[in-house]
Regions:
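Conserved catalytic-core motifs of eukaryotic protein kinase domains, centered on the activation segment
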Residues: 39-41, 84, 118-120
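Proline-centered turn/helix-capping motifs that create local helix->coil transitions or kinks
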Residues: 35-46
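A short linear-motif detector with a strong N-terminal bias
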Residues: 13-15, 45-46, 52-53, 58-59, ...
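Left-handed beta-helix
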Residues: 6-11, 16-25, 30-31, 36-37, ...
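Short, intrinsically disordered/low-complexity patches at protein termini
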Residues: 27, 46-48, 98-99, 104, ...
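Short, small-residue-biased leader/transition segments that mark boundaries at the very start
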Residues: 1-5
Length: 125
């Protein structure tokens, strides 16, 4: 058996890859999808770098990987935030903001993105 590595990424997508973005086989990514790995602390005193010159505003940044497993379909305009895994064969509805990992074999939508349905009778490709 041979490995299949098909991936389709439509136009105007943004991948901010300060860390790994792993995309599995047979993944469909619609247009205007944004995937971010960079993030900042929510605490202002942890965000700003101390003892830097006044003319420079420097923020501490860290990055978390994003993983999109095999068979995933990501609808148009979806935003995927740092540290998220989207499980095998799942579908993310258009316009969703994925703030937490999504399990395999489900449909998830919204802001924040939530599972609304399990997908049964999956045929692997």
């Amino acid at each position: 058996a041979s490995d299949v590595y098909k991936r389709q990424v439509n136009m105007n997508c943004t991948f901010v890859d300060n860390n790994r973005i792993d995309i599995g086989s047979n993944v469909l990514i619609a247009s205007n999808v944004q995937i971010y790995t960079a993030t900042h602390s929510t605490k202002v005193d942890e965000r700003m770098v101390q003892d830097c010159p006044e003319e420079q505003e420097i923020c501490r940044t860290y990055a978390l990987p994003v993983r999109i497993e095999d068979g995933v379909w990501i609808g148009g305009g979806v935003v995927i935030l740092p540290g998220v895994t989207i499980g095998r064969n799942s579908v993310i509805g258009a316009g969703s903001v994925v703030t937490r990992s999504i399990p395999a074999n489900c449909v998830a939508v919204g802001n924040p993105c939530r599972v609304i349905k399990q997908i049964d009778n999956i045929v692997s490709v």
